[in-house]
């Protein structure tokens, strides 16, 4: 993961980062308009940039796919191995809907794993791969949040990013703080407030952690 490039180029995607209502490049607007989602163009631009910074042997893992908006955005004009994991029990989420949205935007076919991440990953669903990005947007209870990061640790490449959504939520923010206090290999490199703190253009906030070697 080229973390230096990510942190250098992220502000360049916007006229006034993080205050801009949307990125300069509006290619993510059709995704937000077509696909039911819980994100904004800004969130999608961040994920797309992160995916573009992966190392040659690293994979992108998304936990919590819903209708596929963020996965489509991450894959847009990026190559590599992408993995989406979801039990599809949130609202009307379904594997079929995700596949339809992937096909509509022509981004190729990721590996879509249907089931509980806390069962699939320990059972070897990722094989010997190393994740350069672990994007967690699933169970946002305090315990679920911490475990959603811990479960990734054996598969993280040196310098990998752990990206977490909805960090405005009190239990998520607290879980992030406690995880960092307990895990010296993880460092918070970016915090972006969301609508609860005056930045609705970032939905409900994001944080990025970097995993050291």
Go through each PLM region and give its residues.
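A short alpha-helical cap/connector motif
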Residues: 1-213
């Amino acid at each position: 993961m080229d973390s230096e490039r990510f942190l250098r180029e992220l502000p360049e995607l916007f006229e006034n980062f993080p205050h801009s209502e949307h990125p300069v490049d509006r290619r993510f607007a059709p995704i937000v308009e077509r696909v039911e989602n819980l994100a904004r163009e800004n969130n999608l631009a961040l994920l797309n940039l992160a995916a573009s910074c992966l190392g040659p042997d690293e994979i992108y893992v998304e936990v919590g796919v819903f209708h596929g908006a963020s996965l489509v955005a991450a894959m847009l004009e990026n190559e590599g191995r992408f993995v989406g994991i979801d039990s599809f029990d949130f609202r009307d989420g379904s594997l079929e809907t995700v596949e339809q949205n992937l096909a509509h935007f022509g981004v190729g076919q990721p590996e879509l794993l249907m089931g509980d991440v806390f069962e699939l990953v320990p059972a070897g669903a990722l094989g010997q791969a190393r994740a350069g990005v672990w994007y967690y947007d699933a169970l946002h209870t305090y315990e679920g949040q911490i475990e959603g990061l811990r479960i990734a640790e054996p598969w993280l490449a040196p310098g990998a990013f752990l990206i977490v959504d909805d960090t405005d939520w009190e239990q998520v923010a607290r879980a992030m703080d406690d995880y960092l206090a307990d895990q010296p290999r993880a460092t918070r490199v970016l915090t972006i407030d969301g609508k609860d703190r005056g930045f609705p253009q970032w939905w409900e906030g994001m944080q990025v952690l970097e995993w050291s070697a």
